[in-house]
Amino acid sequence: LQEAGIPYDPDLVVWFHTEDRRSKPSMMVKEMVKTGSLPHGIVCYNDQIAVQVIESLEDCGLQVPKDISVTGYDNSLYAQRGTGITTIAHPQERLGEMAAELILEKINGVSEEDSRVERLIQPELIVRGSCRRLK
C-alpha cells in the first residue's frame, strides 16, 4: 500500500476468527453494500474466502469485476472457478524445502543466528477475471 501511495486504514480491515469464516465475510459484504461503503476492491486472505465474497456480492446484485474487484491468496483450485480469481501464488514446494531445512538445523543444534535457511519467498501475482484496472 505504502509503495502505491495508498494510506493504510485499519477501519477497512475486517478481522475474524477461523470459526467465523463461513458467516463473517458474507455478513460484512452485505453490511458494506447496505451502508454504501463499498470499496474499489476486496483482498481476501485466501481463495476460499474470495469465492464466498464474490458469491455474496453477486447475491447483492453486484458484478465482479465490473462493480468491484476481488483477490484471493494461495492460487488454490478455488481460484480457477468461472472466469478465475486474481490471486497470489506462493512457492509451496520451496516452503516445504525451507521447513525441512529448518527442522534439520534444529535437530543439528544450529542457532537462529547461524541459520543458513533463506526465509524470504517470492510470491507471484496471477491476474485472472476478478479484477479490473481503475480508470
Which residue stretches match the model-derived regions?
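Bacterial carbohydrate/catabolite-sensing allosteric modules
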Residues: 1-135
